[in-house]
Every structure is written in structure tokens, then in C-alpha cells.
A protein has these predicted regions:
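N-terminal small/glycine-rich loop or linker at the start of catalytic domains
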Residues: 64-72, 141-165, 283-296, 359-361
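Long, compositionally biased, glycine/small-hydrophobic-enriched stretches that function as flexible linkers
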Residues: 1-142
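Active-site mouth loops of central-metabolism enzymes
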Residues: 84, 157-172, 294-304, 365-374
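Hydrophobic faces of well-ordered beta-strands that scaffold small-molecule active sites
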Residues: 155-164, 188-190, 218-226, 243-246, ...
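Glycine-rich, proline-tolerant flexible connector loops at the mouths of alpha/beta enzymes
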Residues: 113-118, 122-130, 189-207, 325-339, ...
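Conserved, mostly hydrophobic/aromatic
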Residues: 180, 383
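Alpha-helix-loop-beta-strand connector modules within alpha/beta enzyme cores
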Residues: 133-141, 145-146, 153-159, 199-227, ...
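Phosphate/diphosphate-binding glycine-rich loops and adjacent basic-rich segments that engage nucleotide
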Residues: 236-298
Length: 454
């Protein structure tokens, strides 16, 4: 295992695979804040050269956190399909990149070997790819999951309807839900981030969602994105629930900062399979985002792309229905501007797909970041080309509760029309039956939620 190279007369030596991974990363303010990123473009290129020559066995044998010290590492390593791994262990990272991008390599081929990849391998190959490489490679990979409906089918583009409200007012939430449905949003999930994180409030909102879903016979899923334990208590108290949500991290310490461990998630999954209202078998919803581990001092010297890949390795253990990165949510301290947000969104989507999970993206930014709505629309268009499973839908793209900017209801509808994609089939049929969509386009009824009042 060689950790040095010479470029144009200068020799670059790296102390560990963890350092190589960090310095091979594209520029991110989060890595610079942590003191991990390359100091110069030349050092970044040198790290990429060294990384390209490492074997997949090198990466498996040197996880960024030791097996004995981190639960996430143990899950990733123990879940590995040894037969798939043995078939590729001698490949270099460069070999893996060339194979994924080869015209002769199919999505089915990639899915077959993906169970033999650790998260460090996934992150490593991502770092050697251009933005177009990430789009091209991700578009090959189809990952589906089933809750009440099936997400990720070829030819579909889904949307989470996110009716957040500053006071959790049921009527305000309902107004956003009905408007979003009329625009074709909500086939991925109708999911609210509550202001009040209590089992009582979770149950109250879930019952309202269930009332709307049952009255109009809407083929979708419902979820309230409170802490996992609050949702579990609400379900035990009798609340209807299709999906249990939790934000996750790429290290045991990061998950502890979020207030849970793997046993908590396993318990939540079992609870919903036995007491939830969904068909299943995929009944979990996870959100991630580059930089979350650094924000809780849980990165242990690893870069944010590698940490993000480890989130996906952790997630796939629990067979989720939805996973999405909230790509610009933490702010410019981690992703400085539109260029970094765009890169991170493409990286996260590719790494999620390569890890074998049904991947979506919250294309978003904070108000103090050097990005605007045009940048987010650009990212959504690129991710649609990459085969992203779903986006967010918030009234006018302005989340007045979480105080950040993301995609609105119209963006997903426009991208569906541009690319010839539809909502999930059962939901698309419902939209047509209700008169909101005709011949693949929104009708004049779109945007008028009053037609769904009852």
C-alpha cells in the first residue's frame, strides 16, 4: 500500500488512508473548517492519484473508524456480502470507477457488486468522478422500495409533500397538503417537520394526514418527522403511521448526538411492521447531509463525503423506504456556495444509489449561503437526469418553519413534464382521476386545493 506520489518534481506523502480520502475530496468548507482538506489543488490531485491506486481490500482493512470502537463500522463490515467482495477485492479504486462508467456495465451489474462495497470504497470512487460521471453512473442504477406504493420505478419522479407550519396549526397544515396534492406532490410521502416534538402532537398530525388520505383514497404514505422515540410512543398510543423517520449520522457518536443507536432503529422498524398502517416491508425514512458529524464533533478526523457514505452504509442495514440528503441545510460553514452544494448533491445521490438505497434529495440552501433559487433548480434538473427518486415540495419553496429555501410544488411537476416522467403509477392514476393531470401535464385545477376540502 503506497501512500505517496511525485508530481512535477514535488513529492506528496500521506500519513493514512483516512488522510488520503480527506485530501482527495473536492473542496468543501466543512473539510477546511475541520483542518482536513487539501491545502492546494496540486495536493488534491496528488491525493487522487494515490487513492486511485489503492485496492478495495486496502479500504476494507482500513475503515476510518476501527471496528472495535464504532457501531456504524461494525454494521457496514458485518453486512458485507463476502462473495461479492471477494470478486472485486483486488480491484483498485480506479478499476472500480472505469468499470462503473463502462458502457457495457449495466445497473444490474452494479447492484450485484454493491453489497460487496464498504462505505469507504463508495466514497473513494466518488472522489475520482466528475459531476457528469456522477450523473451518468447514478442514472444506471435503479433502486426501488415498497411501503404502500413503490418508489424508484423507472420513468417516475416523486415528491415529498412537506406542509410545515410555524405553529403546527392543523388547518394551516391541511391547506398546504391540499394545495400540494393538487400540484401532484405527495406520492413519496406526506411528511411534516413538527414544531412541537411530542408524541401527542405527532399523533394529532398523523390522524389529520390519515383522515385526508382515507377520505380521498390517496395511494401514498404519511409520516411526522419528530424524534424516533416520540414517533414510537405515538404509534404505541394508537396513532396511524406508515413511516418512522430519523436523521442519521455516519458514526456511533454522531447517532448518539441525535439521541439513538442501532437498537433504537431496529426497535422502531419492528414496531411499525407490527403496529403500523403500511403494507411494508420498507417502513423507515432517513435524512442525512454532509457536515452533520462535524457539527457534533463526531467525525473523528474523517472528511464529510466519507462520513456521508457511511450514513448510507448504516441506512441500508434497515431496508428504508426513503433516504434523502438535505444537501445545503447546515449552511456555508460546510458547503460554501452553489458550486459546493451542487457537487455535494450529485455525490450524495450517487453514493446512496451505489450503496443500494432508494435515494432522494432535498435541494436546498440557507439564507446566508452564496446560492439562490436558480442554483437549486439547476441541481434538481441535474439530479433528474441522474435518476433521483424524489425531491421536496414546499409552498413556493420557502419553508417558513425550518427557515430555509428548497424546491416548491411546481418544480417536480415541471421536471416530470420535461423528461416524460410521472408520479408513482397509482398516484399518477389518482391525479388523473381527480382532474389535476391530463396527458402528462397539470390542468387548470392544479394549485386549487379547495376542490379537496371536505
Amino acid at each position: 500500500m503506497k501512500l505517496k506520489t511525485t508530481l512535477l518534481g514535488s513529492t506528496y506523502t500521506f500519513g493514512s488512508i483516512r488522510e488520503v480520502l480527506a485530501k482527495a475530496n473536492e473542496e468543501k468548507t466543512g473539510d477546511r473548517l475541520a483542518g482536513l482538506g487539501a491545502e492546494t489543488a496540486q495536493e488534491r490531485i496528488a491525493a487522487k492519484v494515490v487513492l486511485s491506486a489503492l485496492t478495495l481490500a486496502d479500504l476494507r482493512e482500513n475503515p476510518v473508524f476501527p471496528y472495535e470502537q464504532d457501531e456504524v463500522t461494525r454494521i457496514i463490515q458485518d453486512d458485507l456480502n463476502e462473495k461479492a467482495y471477494e470478486s472485486i477485492r483486488g480491484w483498485t479504486v480506479s478499476d472500480l470507477r472505469e468499470w462503473i462508467l463502462a458502457e457495457t456495465t449495466t445497473g444490474a451489474d452494479i447492484r450485484r457488486i454493491s453489497r460487496g462495497l464498504t462505505s469507504e470504497m463508495v466514497a473513494a470512487v466518488c472522489k475520482l468522478m466528475s459531476n457528469l460521471d456522477l450523473i451518468y453512473a447514478a442514472n444506471k442504477i435503479t433502486v426501488t422500495a415498497h411501503c404502500n406504493t413503490t418508489i424508484g420505478l423507472p420513468g417516475t419522479l416523486s415528491c415529498r409533500l412537506q406542509p410545515n407550519h410555524t405553529t403546527d396549526d392543523p388547518e394551516g397544515i391541511t391547506a398546504s397538503v391540499l394545495e400540494g396534492l393538487s400540484f401532484g406532490a405527495g406520492d413519496a410521502v406526506i411528511g411534516l417537520n413538527p414544531v412541537t416534538d411530542s408524541p401527542e402532537q405527532v399523533g394529532k398530525v398523523l390522524r389529520r394526514f390519515q383522515q385526508i388520505k382515507e377520505h380521498w383514497q390517496i395511494p401514498t404514505q404519511i409520516c411526522v418527522l419528530a424524534h424516533v422515540t416520540a414517533q414510537m410512543k405515538a404509534v404505541r398510543d394508537g396513532a396511524p403511521c406508515d413511516l418512522i423517520f430519523q436523521s442519521i449520522a455516519g458514526s456511533e457518536k454522531g447517532n448518539a448526538a441525535f439521541g439513538f443507536n442501532a437498537a433504537t432503529i431496529a426497535e422502531a422498524r419492528e414496531l411499525l411492521l407490527h403496529q403500523g398502517t403500511a403494507e411494508g416491508p420498507n417502513v423507515l425514512y432517513f435524512e442525512t447531509g454532509q457536515g452533520s458529524e462535524l457539527s457534533s464533533d463526531a467525525h473523528h478526523g474523517a472528511d464529510q463525503v466519507t462520513m456521508e457514505a457511511r450514513c448510507y452504509g448504516f441506512a441500508r442495514h434497515f431496508k428504508p423506504f426513503l433516504v434523502n440528503t438535505v444537501v445545503g441545510f447546515i449552511g456555508p460553514e460546510y458547503l460554501y456556495d452553489a458550486r459546493q452544494v451542487t457537487r455535494a448533491g450529485l455525490e450524495d445521490h450517487f453514493m446512496g444509489k451505489l450503496s443500494g438505497i432508494p435515494m432522494g434529495c432535498d435541494c436546498c440552501y440557507t439564507n446566508h449561503m452564496k446560492a439562490d433559487q436558480n442554483d437549486i433548480e439547476n441541481l434538481a434538473a441535474l439530479l433528474t437526469m441522474a435518476g433521483c427518486n424524489y425531491f421536496m415540495g414546499i409552498p413556493h419553496g420557502d419553508d417558513i418553519m425550518l427557515n430555509y429555501q428548497t424546491t416548491g410544488f411546481r418544480e417536480t411537476a415541471a421536471l416530470r413534464e420535461l423528461t416524460g416522467k410521472t408520479a408513482i403509477p397509482e398516484f399518477q392514476q389518482w391525479l388523473e382521476k381527480m382532474g389535476f393531470v391530463e396527458n402528462g401535464k397539470l390542468t387548470k385545477k392544479a394549485g386549487d386545493g379547495s376542490s379537496l376540502l371536505f
